[in-house]
Amino acid sequence: MTQQDPAAAAPRPVLVVDFGAQYAQLIARRVREVNLYSEVIPHTMPADEVAAKNPAALILSGGPSSVYADDAPSLHPELLELGVPVFGICYGFQAMTQAMGGTVAKTGLREYGRTELQIQSEAGVLHEGMGESQQVWMSHGDSVSEAPEGFTVTARTEGAPVAAFECPEKRMAGVQYHPEVLHSPKGQEVLRRFLLETAGLEPTWTAGNIAEQLIEQVREQIGDEGRAICGLSGGVDSAVAAALVQRAIGDRLTCVFVDHGLLRAGEREQVEKDFVAATGAKLVTVDEREAFLQKLAGVTEPEAKRKAIGAEFIRSFERAVAGVLADAPEGSSVDFLVQGTLYPDVVESGGGTGTANIKSHHNVGGLPDDVEFELVEPLRLLFKDEVRAVGRELGLPEEIVARQPFPGPGLGIRIIGEVTEDRLETLRAADAIARAELTAAGLDDVIWQCPVVLLADVRSVGVQGDGRTYGHPIVLRPVSSEDAMTADWTRIPFDVLEKISTRITNEVEEVNRVVLDVTSKPPGTIEWE
């Protein structure tokens, strides 16, 4: 299995140098909100490799370490000599200070959480016109006590005598606080000013330009005669990926919808109707429900489930290829497989240097090593909101682009325990009720997604009618998010929760308890498995 490096078709990136920050991906996303392309790289990347990426600017992220710790992440001084704009945040601010001859002190004055930032008389470009003070989010122990030579101190706090500085001549600046988080209300404007005014970058990373670049990239990868096959899951990612490839190579793309039996109620019909109507793409639907259930028989370990589903999905594709080839010119083959892999998928699967593997993602690590296709992943560098924007640019209807995320392995990873037909029917019924009530309450635009999970290996004691019951609990997992990198549990009104619980326990056999998951991400991932 081979893949093309999609970064080759991207514009010059704003590189976020990750020093172990919790919010490194969020920084990249905030940069993209300014319509600039951004990637995250580890602080261990050699300076020559960083230079080879031809960065438009560098942002040095925060991190949990003290610059005085023996194992503190180091900043390669050569990065400050590349001649590109540099912006330091929190730990990156301190590392930048040390590398350029300033002073970082152990003041003993720690600042965590909301802090009042005092703007100096020389406010500089970043804080000009923002008043004498503003609320920011701090998380530091050490503080910069003296700025490097040539830098102007523009802000301070009680615990940080130098909380921000700038050097317009070098196109460098830094802040002790976290401008990327919502708890710093003016932080995004500060970041925007650095990128557009101090760094002088042109904001060209728009939905229209992204779509054009990706279409051209796909044409280049597949060529003038190559043929591709794309698996549709019913979700926005695969639909947008397929629409991009369809725009690039036309009828040389065949979309395959594998009904693996792990779908929610009505999903097969929705794909066959909505997607074909929107794109005019060729669609082949194959019924593989029995094959998937056989592969999942007796499998309870989450990773084993993902691997089994991924492996069988590819085998289903290979069986479908024979039918696709029947309509192809004599002697031709299908060599390319289109996937809707997103940037968070790659990050969670440890796809970047220095990242930990959280779980194998169904679009990244769940494929067999002997897969016979070359992967086409046009969305690999995009966040979910960017995918939706590209989908709208391509003319896909809201029913597709606004659809809540649904994992490729489907309900298979929302059943905690062995996957059986009876358990699927139970979960399908509960899920349909939850979705219907959330829609009726007008919460579709509030909730990022709401996984409904069946604890199939748990028996809960209950009383229904005049008898004692031993049913299964259902877990509701509503979350709010911007890009799935982080998420907070959604505060659904109690009356809506009551309706969902009452209907599920009354209408779904085998369920006698409904519980609410109130865990944010981190520490918990959105899906249970």
UniProtKB/Swiss-Prot annotation:
Pathway(s): Purine metabolism; GMP biosynthesis; GMP from XMP (L-Gln route): step 1/1
Pfam families linked to this entry: GATase (PF00117), GMP_synt_C (PF00958), NAD_synthase (PF02540)
Top-rank EC class of the record's enzyme: ligase
EC number: 6.3.5.2
One CC-aspect GO term: cytosol
InterPro entries, per the entry: Class_I_gatase-like (IPR029062), GATASE (IPR017926), GMP_synth_C (IPR001674), GMP_synth_GATase (IPR004739), GMP_synthase (IPR022955), GMPS_ATP_PPase_dom (IPR025777), NAD/GMP_synthase (IPR022310), Rossmann-like_a/b/a_fold (IPR014729)
Subunit structure: Homodimer.
Protein name: GMP synthase [glutamine-hydrolyzing]
